[in-house]
From Swiss-Prot:
PANTHER family: RE52890P, UBIQUITIN CARBOXYL-TERMINAL HYDROLASE. The keyword Coiled coil applies. Residues 107-140, 232-263, 490-767 are annotated as: Disordered. Residues 540-554, 564-573, 701-713 have a biased composition (Low complexity). It comes from Aspergillus fumigatus (strain CBS 144.89 / FGSC A1163 / CEA10). The keyword Protease applies. The active site is at residues 58, 413. This is Probable ubiquitin carboxyl-terminal hydrolase creB. Belongs to the peptidase C19 family. CDD domains: Peptidase_C19G. It is an enzyme of class 3 (hydrolase).
Length: 767
């Protein structure tokens, strides 16, 4: 009764509250972007499905998304061996496609409110302070809501309808055909059947551990090749030669992939396979040997503050083979120093570039992630090709990037950023699919805050005309966006307003927190933190912020407050189309001229390199010849010196013997002459009582007397010069030397020479 007196608006006890009408969930940014699309296409290019994560299966989801949006690969998978008729495909999808309850979100919110109210009404139970409301902009919340609101597509094993045994290829074909045949543009795929086959055939994927996306890509492509070739070998030759009935689209696509028949087994090779040539030049004989090897993806080493072009240049740089890594030259017949380089001989249509972010370090004894800044372009032209390469000027465009988010190779998360045909770039994060801006792709060079880095880059071939057309379309879209931004500045009564005034009016609105906070400078982040959700979502879904750097007000110049000028901005003149065409033509001519200049510069560099190599070869040849001549002259000199040393060793003793014998004969001749002269003199008596000590000087005096008598009796020697001393007469110096020698011999005790001279003299006297 008391409640009734309080007011008439209070409900009665027995009254039943009115049931809320179910409201549809708010539109996602992807649904807003797909509003203006026409009827559903049969090729599946307008389907945008997420993939459910079954526990660390993000590596599989990101690679499968990149392969699906590769148009030639998707068409080749669907058309081999035959394309399933659309009627049977729709009948199968009617059983596997499950639509969720549209009121699931409302029921979940009502259940949460009821639980919250029940917890608040319990007496003595304080509210849980740690329980926080869910962040509706977080990827986890968006993934949960996608699972509750979007159609779920479960794939089934249809290998028997393809005439093949169950394999990874048939499971991949099941996924692609299910998406193409579905009547909904958005949804979620459950690749449970594919993961079961993967874990059945490969043990390394049976655990819930973190796996490498590049390893999975390489394994999947090789498995597809093996499965297709194994099934083709089972078919008889007659059946393989006859093309199966196909639709016109599949026949056109098979001819565009370069295959003669729709069911050829070479389509994987023609799309992803390239040919590398290893050139090795021996530095001794200068012979060049080549060895070819195929590749499905290119793995390039990374350097800090580099680009994909510089990494490819390093990939094809010359490597010196020396010391323990010498090259065995067949021409020289042994290990020789050589130069080795890798070049591309055949370019693939789809180029998968693996950036080697994980490197093994000896210090840590494990793999470590490299957070190097590596810039990758939207368009790429390879230069490290051979001279006889097929289509060396092929132009590539970036259409998919696999991003690794994490601090190491053993944990983390993979997402894919893919460029669709006509809906721009999309972010595929497991169950969540969101549109992103083109500049968002540049956030994963490796130098941004966070742990997100580009890991695998997918490039597909394109033409220069397509690139110019795309740039023109982007310019038109940017001009249209600028015009729409100018229109939003106008007031409802038609008068324009300055953006600065709008900003001031927005900033002057006080809030309760501002009143409680002391006045001062507010801290504004200078670099927004990277994330994979609301920061890069659709601008239309984000709330308007006049101070945001992405606001159109901050990108456009102020408009003067004149109504006539506003109308001119809103309606561009008719000559803009002609001006755009003129600019496009000038841009095309400039690109062509730039291409010609690049070709001329490339030719000039090649000629300069050829001249430098020729000069280097000539200098090396001259140096080699000089070394050979030096070695030959040194060998000749060594032989001559060894020959002379040998002769001197052989004739040394004989020459000394000859000289010794000549001097001995000269002395004997002199002694003989002395004896002949002394024989004419009368004998001199020798006292018997004289001792050896007295005999010494007496004999010397007698010898001097005999020599004087001999000089008087002998005729003069006319051959001797008049001033020269006589031969028989000793000089004073010679006499002193003889006496000195005799005294020395006497002092040293060697008296044999003295006795010999006395004996000789005595014999001469007696004779």
């Amino acid at each position: 009764m008391f409640c009734l007196l309080l007011g008439s608006t209070a409900p009665s006890v027995g009254a039943v509250p009115a049931k809320k009408e179910p409201q549809p969930p708010p539109m996602t940014p992807l649904e807003k972007r797909l509003l203006d699309m026409g009827p559903i296409r049969e090729d599946g290019s307008d389907k945008f499905y997420g993939m459910e994560n079954y526990g660390n299966t993000c590596y599989c989801n990101s690679i499968l998304q990149c392969l699906y949006y590769s148009v030639p690969f998707r068409e080749a998978v669907i058309n081999y061996p035959t394309r399933t008729p659309i009627e049977s495909l729709e009948a199968a999808l009617a059983k596997s496609l499950r639509y969720p309850n549209p009121n699931a979100q409302l029921e979940a919110e009502a259940q949460a409110e009821k639980q919250k109210a029940a917890n608040a009404q319990r007496p003595g139970m304080p509210p849980n302070p740690q329980q926080k409301p869910e962040d509706k902009d977080s990827p986890e919340y968006k993934k949960k809501m996608a699972l509750q609101t979007l159609p779920l597509l479960e794939t089934q094993n249809n290998a028997s309808s393809y005439g093949m045994s169950e394999s990874l290829f048939t499971s991949l074909k099941d996924i692609f055909e299910s998406v193409v045949g579905s009547q909904s543009r958005i949804g979620i795929i459950r690749p449970q059947q594919f993961l079961e086959v993967l874990r059945r055939d490969h043990e390394m994927f049976r655990t819930a551990m973190h796996q490498d996306a590049h390893e999975f890509l390489n394994l999947l492509l090789n498995e597809v090749v093996a499965n297709v070739e194994a099934e083709a070998s089972k078919q008889p030759p007659i059946e393989k030669s006859l093309p199966a009935p196909e639709t016109a689209d599949s026949v056109d696509q098979s001819s565009s992939t370069g295959s003669k028949t729709p069911n050829t087994t070479r389509w994987v090779h023609e799309l992803f396979e390239g040919l590398l040539t290893s050139e090795t030049q021996c530095l001794t004989c200068e012979k060049v040997s080549q060895r070819d090897e195929v590749f499905l993806d290119l793995s390039v080493d990374l350097e800090q503050h580099s680009s994909v072009t510089s990494c490819l240049r390093k990939f094809s740089a010359e490597e010196m083979l020396c010391e323990r890594n010498k090259f065995h030259c067949d021409n020289c017949g042994g290990l020789q120093e050589a130069e080795k380089r890798m070049k591309i001989k055949r370019l693939p249509r789809i180029l998968a570039l693996h950036l080697k972010r994980f490197k093994y370090t000896e210090d840590l004894q494990r793999l470590q992630k490299l957070f190097h800044r590596v810039v990758y372009p939207y368009h790429l032209r390879l230069f490290n090709t051979t001279d006889d390469a097929e289509d060396p000027d092929r132009l590539y465009e970036l259409y998919a990037v696999v991003v690794h988010i994490g601090g190491g190779p053993y944990h983390g998360h993979y997402v894919a950023i893919i460029k669709t045909e006509d809906r721009g770039w999309l972010l595929f994060d497991d169950e969540m699919v969101e549109p992103v801006d083109k500049n968002y792709v540049k956030n994963f060079f490796g130098d941004k805050p966070g742990l997100a880095c580009a890991y695998v880059l997918f490039y597909q071939e394109t033409t220069l005309e397509a690139v110019l057309k795309e740039q023109e379309q982007e310019n038109m879209d940017s001009n249209l966006a600028a015009t729409d931004a100018n229109d939003t500045i106008l007031k409802q009564n038609g008068f324009p307003q300055s953006p600065l005034a709008h900003v001031h009016s927005a900033s002057q609105i006080p809030s309760h927190e501002d009143n409680l906070r002391p006045n001062g400078l507010r801290r504004a982040p200078t670099a927004p933190q990277l994330s994979t959700h609301h920061e890069h979502g659709d601008p239309e879904s984000a709330p308007f912020s006049p101070l945001s750097p992405l606001s159109p007000l901050s990108q456009t110049p102020p408009v003067p407050p004149v109504p006539e000028r506003v109308t001119t901005v809103a309606t561009p003149p008719k000559n803009d189309a002609l001006a755009k065409k003129e600019r496009a033509r000038e841009e095309k001519e400039r690109k062509a001229a730039e291409k010609e200049r690049e070709k001329a510069e490339k030719l000039r560099r090649k000629e300069q390199e050829a001249r430098m190599k020729e000069n280097q070869r000539r200098e090396e040849a001259e140096l080699k010849a000089a070394l050979e001549m030096s070695k030959a002259s040194k060998a000749e000199e060594d032989r001559r010196l060894s020959h002379e040393n040998g002769k001197e060793k052989q004739g040394g003793s004989l020459s000394r013997l000859k000289r010794g014998s000549k001097s001995l004969s000269h002395r004997l001749g002199k002694d003989k002459e002395t004896r002949s002269v002394s024989s004419d003199l009368p004998p001199v008596p020798i006292p018997e009582h004289s001792t050896l000590s007295q005999t010494g000087p007496t004999s010397e005096q007698q010898q001097q007397q005999q020599q004087q008598q001999q000089q008087q009796q002998s005729p003069p020697n006319h051959d001797q010069p008049p001033n020269s001393p006589q031969l028989g007469k000793p000089t004073i110096r010679e006499d002193e030397q003889v006496n000195h020698k005799d005294s020395k011999h006497e002092r040293t005790g060697h008296g044999k020479w003295r006795s010999f001279s006395l004996r000789k003299k005595s014999f001469s006297i007696l004779s």
